[in-house]
A protein has these predicted regions:
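Non-heme di-metal
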Residues: 1-163
């Protein structure tokens, strides 16, 4: 495919991705509210539509951005989290405080602290992949099978669950 960089089409893809992503989240919130109010069928329709919107968002994201290896994706995610906690939420909190919304500013600062933890976690996971340490540790740790729950204390996770 032709390079999209600098095109209105790329801008449109990113706008479509953002819109579909926001719609998906909004519909899941609406589904929760409908279910709490006793409207299970309406809740299910919101959830079904949210799943559709997720697929639409993925289509636009793949065209606009692509999906790399897990290590590349972790580093990309870390960069996004870094921007959120170092720039975005800091600036938004400042604006909220200046406009007389200290409670919103405090919430944004609280979320910024969480985003910093997200960045650190993603960078550590990427380093584990790079160093070949995803399934091994320097000391014994608890490994648990994600299928059956079998637990093993060892330095390395087993290739296959012994159960």
């Amino acid at each position: 495919m032709k390079d999209l960089k600098g095109t209105k089409t790329l801008e449109n893809l990113l706008t479509a991705f953002a819109g579909e992503s926001q719609a998906r989240n909004k519909y899941t919130y609406y589904a929760s509210k409908a279910k709490k109010e006793g409207y299970v069928q309406i809740s299910n329709i919101f959830l079904e539509t949210a799943a559709n919107e997720k697929e639409h968002a993925e289509l636009w994201f793949k065209l606009a951005h692509g999906i790399g290896t897990t290590e590349e994706n972790l580093l990309d995610a870390a960069e996004g989290e870094n921007y959120e906690w170092t720039d975005m939420y800091k600036e938004m909190a400042t604006t909220a405080r200046e406009e007389g919304f200290p409670e919103i500013a405090a919430q944004m600062e609280g979320v910024a602290a969480i985003e910093k933890e997200h960045e650190e976690r993603y960078r550590k996971l990427a380093a584990n992949i790079k160093e070949g340490k995803v399934f091994e540790r320097e000391e014994k740790v608890l490994w648990q099978c994600s299928n059956c729950g079998h637990q093993l204390v060892a330095e390395k996770a087993p290739q296959l669950c012994p159960v």
